[in-house]
Regions:
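C-terminal catalytic "cap/lid" subdomain
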Residues: 2-73, 77-105, 109-266
Length: 266
């Protein structure tokens, strides 16, 4: 089935790639700058093939903790929002460094739920994405966590990336996390869990798997990834789930040597 995944990536020209917090964090909670550099290099190879890339990057809070470790245990919402404000600067600094080494400029978009619900704002986002891509700039998107409150939150970057893919009319959405894809059970606790390589029917998938809780650093989990697939597949955009921590994951997905779960469209 890796051939199906390989073909999906090869056939896509406009690709949105979401990178989860666990992929961007090392075990000690600091930024995984090695991954960021490798990822930018792999993106350059895709861009050289004529593909366009939009990155949806989590990691503001992780980057904030890396900078101000003494705030790590603070639970107050104002501290968390302030931590994201500090961390977003650090996050973009590292992304700028990673992509500049490949001769690529980046542009930042911090978005909220309101931006997608307002026709004028969403049109401006779409136009900005098209302009950046036409000029060879890679957009890097995150939710504006410092100003978002519960009723105006998208809440997780799986759904943010799905909304972005739909708005930009992407050909493929890739969700990177710390697991290889969707399994019949949690592979970290059940060694007999099997990967689901291709999903053609989401309601049937829900009946056949066990959905666990969100991960340590992120706000999502398997449930939010399925929600994202429910959004994009309606618009003819397949979703690929894969483990971003694997070395050269983008390249290996393209050549068919990496595992993943592909939500297909009909």
């Amino acid at each position: 089935m890796s051939e199906v995944i390989s073909e999906a990536l090869k056939n896509a020209r406009k690709i949105v790639i979401k990178i989860g917090s666990n992929t961007l964090a090392k075990d000690d909670g600091t930024q995984n700058t090695e991954f960021m550099a490798s990822f930018a290099s792999q993106c350059k190879k895709l861009i050289d093939q004529g593909k366009q890339i939009v990155v949806v990057s989590s990691g503001a809070q992780v980057s904030g903790v890396s900078t101000l470790s003494e705030w790590a245990r603070k639970k107050d919402v104002h501290f968390r929002q302030a931590l994201c404000a500090i961390g977003q600067v650090e996050l973009m600094t590292q992304w700028r460094k990673a992509f500049s080494e490949q001769g690529i400029h980046i542009g930042q978009l911090l978005l909220t739920k309101e931006d997608f619900e307002n026709d004028h704002r969403s049109l401006n986002i779409r136009n900005t994405l098209f302009t950046l891509e036409d000029e060879g700039v890679v957009p890097i998107i995150n939710e504006n966590d410092s100003v978002s409150i519960d009723e105006f939150q998208i809440g997780d970057n799986d759904n943010l990336s799905a909304l972005t893919a739909i708005l930009w009319s992407a050909d493929l959405l890739i969700l990177f996390s710390d697991v290889d894809g969707i399994f019949t059970d949690n592979p970290k606790t059940n060694k007999n869990a099997k990967i689901v390589e291709v999903v053609e029917n989401i309601p049937e998938l829900r009946k056949s798997i066990r959905i666990g809780e969100k991960n340590a650093f992120g706000t999502g989990g398997i449930e939010t990834k399925i929600q994202a697939a429910e959004k994009t597949t309606v618009y003819g955009i397949p979703i690929l789930l894969a483990n971003g921590s694997h070395e050269n994951i983008l390249t290996n997905l393209e050549n068919g040597t990496a595992k993943g779960t592909l939500f297909t469209v009909h």
